[in-house]
Design a protein with these regions (language model features):
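Short, flexible active-site-adjacent loop segments at beta-strand->alpha-helix junctions, enriched
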Residues: 10, 24-25, 48, 71, ...
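Non-catalytic C-terminal accessory region of glycerolipid acyltransferases
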Residues: 76-214
Length: 214
């Protein structure tokens, strides 16, 4: 039902636990995310209100997900996530915490940073494009065009001396979101479009390209 392009989705079996962090533009995001890599030990956090959805809920239950009660601190889901990571699983989540109706990045919540701080696992950014177009595709009797780009794994930046915890979490969260923003078109970067860290990452990419071509 879609034309799908997937880039750099090879997650080595030797990678023992990692967070997959992605932008969130569609209910289908978690399905595409979990099926885009060949690794079988992949699970994702998903809002518990989808559990009762007849069609979509059935798919999610079959895939296997961690149900998250959105809008409150779901410590059970956080503990379950940490347990999977400690067992070496790959866990997907959307740092924004909810679907962006505009398709553009919205300000993220600190959950992804707190999990990464607790577990120390690497983080793999993923950019999703086109997953929100199912309704449009059905109306026009055509396939969806979906692009999924995986970035390089990275670790949270180190906390600086005398840096307040709240400031550090915000800086680490910006790092995660800017690494996602690099993987999606400019018009989807939304809240993070003008972030200095994003500009720095884009400059690094251009510099690497120039070095390769010379």
């Amino acid at each position: 039902f879609c034309n799908q392009k997937i880039y750099n989705a090879e997650i080595p079996e030797s990678l023992n636990g990692a967070l997959l962090v992605t932008n969130h533009i569609s209910r289908l995001d978690v399905v595409f995310l979990m099926l885009s890599t060949k690794r079988k030990d992949v699970i994702a956090l998903t809002a518990s209100n989808y559990r009762r959805a007849l069609f979509f809920g059935t798919i999610l239950k079959k895939l296997g997900v961690i149900w998250l009660d959105r809008g409150e601190s779901d410590f059970k889901a956080m503990r379950e996530t940490a347990d999977y990571l400690k067992k070496g699983w790959i866990v997907g989540l959307a740092p924004e915490g909810r679907r962006s109706r505009s398709g553009k990045l919205i300000k993220a919540k600190p959950g992804a940073v707190l999990i990464a701080m607790k577990t120390g696992v690497p983080i793999i950014p993923v950019g999703l494009v086109g997953t929100a177009d199912m309704g449009k595709a059905i109306r026009k009797w055509r396939k969806m065009d979906v692009t999924i780009k995986f970035g390089e794994a990275f670790y949270l930046p180190e906390q600086e001396e005398n840096e307040h915890n709240r400031d550090y979490v915000e800086r680490a969260l910006d790092e995660i979101m800017c690494r996602i923003a690099v993987l999606i078109p400019e018009e989807q970067r939304g809240f993070y479009a003008d972030h200095p860290r994003l500009k720095s990452l884009l400059a690094e990419i251009e510099e690497a390209k120039a070095t390769t071509e010379s």
